[in-house]
Amino acid sequence: MIQLNEPLTHVRTKPILISLEFESPGRKTIDSVATESVLNSVVKINTFSSKPNICYPWQNKPQKKSKGSGFVIPGKMIITNAHVVANHILVLVIKRGSPKKYKAEVKAIGRECDLAILVIESKEFWEDMNPLELGDMPFLQESVNVIGYPTGGENISVTKGVVSRIESMDYAHGAINLPAIQTDAAMNPGNSGGPVCIGNKVVGVAFQTLGHSNNIGCLIPAPVVKHFITGVEKTGQYVGFCSLNLSYQHMDAQTRSHFKMNSEMTGILIYNINQHSDALNILKKYDVILSIDGVAIENDGTVIIPNRERTRLDDLVSLKQLGETILLKILREGKMHEFNITLRPVQRLVPAGQIDNNPSYYIFAGFVFVPLRKQHFKGSNGEQIVVISEVLADVINVEYYMYKHLKVNSVNKVKVENLKHLCELIEKCCTKDLRLELGDGRVIILDYQFAKSSTSLILERHRVPWAMSKDLMTDQSTTCSSTRLY
């Protein structure tokens, strides 16, 4: 059964909201009949994938095959969902009405927005393939067609419904809250990555359903897709979604009075600014944000867009491009101020459930060190939280066998900055004892030379080919005696 927000892969400074590209309610509605040209631009995607083993990062889990959908866009590219090609080994694309499979490469993948771009070298594939045009955010009750290759058959499927809701929601495959569209059109596993059209224009991409409800399918809106594509076209890679990187609270009448707001003012109260935010040296704790780019902020952190539904203030920021600025109107100690803030993408210490990247790890004396796989903000200096994910049993570590999932604070009293730094500190240790201080206060003491000589035997006994991941091996400054194959 598809659970709440589960992806649909088979087998599992202008005072307007520029980024959402809202049109006036007078826009002419095109009849939502799916034409042959649209259907021919929708493809079936077969993916062979293998997830990394989190506890044993040098291993992969058994291979599996899954099915999804995609569609052709200008530039000889194919749009699909990130979860359709996650951890891919091989991606094959099949055109409508054809048995031939074409090998595809993943050009870019955006986990947060659950989107990916595929490219195919074969000239034959692109014959008679017409790219689909991305439209705008639809309006409530507009009719839409969901097109793709869901479970239940091999031929293309078209289902019809209406736009039932537009609001921000958590993307199941990502780690961010973004605008989304809900529809009552039937959506099933395999629809993921397929276009949702009004006439010949794509207004969304199918990506997940609400499992504990009836007939609620979720779409990635065209403005989010455009943001993703624009970033890839400008930089050649996924650039992410911008954020002010600050925390705020709603304001009731008592709070507004305390912070000297008059009866006509509305806004939200900043209570924390991330140390890596571009706003750190501009905004202050307990500043009140009254508006963003001229759009008033309500006391509950929402904004009102003319002729549209109320939405979160974060949506005024998230779809801006890297390096754009926004104008903030601030109330500080009863006085009004205006500041321009340059926006940067949200950076995470380690994106939850990394995809398409071999996990980083380092093994010494049987202790398996990895970066924490949980959402955290990341500093420009590459700071990470390093934890012990597993202890490969040996006489040297038997007393520490239960010391798993614990943060490593320091090595020989030097604070650990990231996994690479921990590796360097251990490999270049020049003291008799190696001292590891953990996050809960416990300490690990190892005879360094004995531990170093034991590492080779431990790796061989546990059938581990390498003492560290390739990304650590490529660092020439790290001189590791245990990087050879055992």
Curated annotation (Swiss-Prot):
<dbReference type="InterPro" id="IPR009003">
    <property type="entry name" value="Peptidase_S1_PA"/>
</dbReference>
<dbReference type="Pfam" id="PF13365">
    <property type="entry name" value="Trypsin_2"/>
</dbReference>
<dbReference type="Pfam" id="PF17815">
    <property type="entry name" value="PDZ_3"/>
</dbReference>
<comment type="similarity">
    <text>Belongs to the peptidase S1C family.</text>
</comment>
<dbReference type="GO" id="GO:0006508">
    <property type="term" value="P:proteolysis"/>
</dbReference>
<dbReference type="GO" id="GO:0004252">
    <property type="term" value="F:serine-type endopeptidase activity"/>
</dbReference>
<keyword id="KW-0645">Protease</keyword>
<dbReference type="InterPro" id="IPR036034">
    <property type="entry name" value="PDZ_sf"/>
</dbReference>
<keyword id="KW-0720">Serine protease</keyword>
<dbReference type="InterPro" id="IPR046449">
    <property type="entry name" value="DEGP_PDZ_sf"/>
</dbReference>
<feature type="domain" description="PDZ">
    <location>
        <begin position="241"/>
        <end position="334"/>
    </location>
</feature>
<dbReference type="InterPro" id="IPR001940">
    <property type="entry name" value="Peptidase_S1C"/>
</dbReference>
<feature type="active site" description="Charge relay system">
    <location>
        <position position="83"/>
    </location>
</feature>
<dbReference type="InterPro" id="IPR041517">
    <property type="entry name" value="DEGP_PDZ"/>
</dbReference>
<feature type="active site" description="Charge relay system">
    <location>
        <position position="114"/>
    </location>
</feature>
<protein>
    <recommendedName>
        <fullName>Putative protease Do-like 13</fullName>
        <ecNumber>3.4.21.-</ecNumber>
    </recommendedName>
</protein>
<feature type="region of interest" description="Serine protease">
    <location>
        <begin position="44"/>
        <end position="229"/>
    </location>
</feature>
<keyword id="KW-0378">Hydrolase</keyword>
<comment type="function">
    <text>Putative serine protease.</text>
</comment>
<dbReference type="Pfam" id="PF13180">
    <property type="entry name" value="PDZ_2"/>
</dbReference>
<feature type="active site" description="Charge relay system">
    <location>
        <position position="192"/>
    </location>
</feature>
<dbReference type="InterPro" id="IPR001478">
    <property type="entry name" value="PDZ"/>
</dbReference>
